[in-house]
Structures are given as structure tokens and as C-alpha cells.
Amino acid sequence: MTPSLYNPLAIASKPFPAIYSEKILIFTIFSAFAEFERDMIVERTQEGKMLAKQNPDFREGRPKKFTKQQINHALTLLENHSYKQVEDMTGISVSTLVRAKKKKAAEAING
């Protein structure tokens, strides 16, 4: 039975070959570097977001692929064409059209 890596007393209280101790040392060093690198990535990401938020045109998240005008045009095409036909004409996927149509209907209900 090997002792827990997270319990240093269990490791220190039992004699182990030098190879095992070296493995623990290397594992600990690599773990520390990995944690440090992760913290640095988080820190750089947060700094970049703070700088980007200073721009008044900043919008967090994924940019929209289609403008509202393009979506509205596609929705008007749906009055006379099928979803597949509108998809072929505009390049807007059926799922996006369905989602936009539901959103437009909800906005009409809510005012």
C-alpha cells in the first residue's frame, strides 16, 4: 500500500527507496510550476479584460455573426419561403432563424 501523496506525515513516517522520494520531489516541483502558470494566465486575462473594458465600444463575449438588419431581413423572407430556402438565400442557419423568430415573438408579447 502506497501512502497518500497529500499526507506528508504518511510519507515521512515510512521508509521508501530514493526513487520514490525523487518522484515525489519532481511531481511537487512540476505541480508548483503548473499552478504558477495557471495563476499567471488568469492574471493576464483579467488585466486584458480590464484594459478592454475601458473602451466604450467593448462588448464582452462572442461577437454577433449577423446584424439585426440581416436577421430582420431573413425573418421577412420567412413569410414567403421555407426555413431551408431562407437559409440557402441568406446563409443564416435554421436554428438561428428559429431562435430569432422566438425572440421576436417574445418581444412582441412583452411590448
Swiss-Prot record:
The keyword NAD does not apply. Residues 1-56 form the Resolvase/invertase-type recombinase catalytic domain. It comes from the Bacteria. This is Resolvase homolog YefC. Residues 83-102 bind DNA. GO terms for molecular function: DNA binding; DNA strand exchange activity. The lineage of its organism: Bacteria, Bacillati, Bacillota, Bacilli, Bacillales. Keywords: DNA-binding. Gene3D superfamilies: 6.10.250.10, Homeodomain-like (1.10.10.60). InterPro entries: Cry35Ab1_HTH, Homeodomain-like_sf, Resolv_N, Resolvase-like_N_sf. The gene is yefC. The keyword DNA-binding applies.
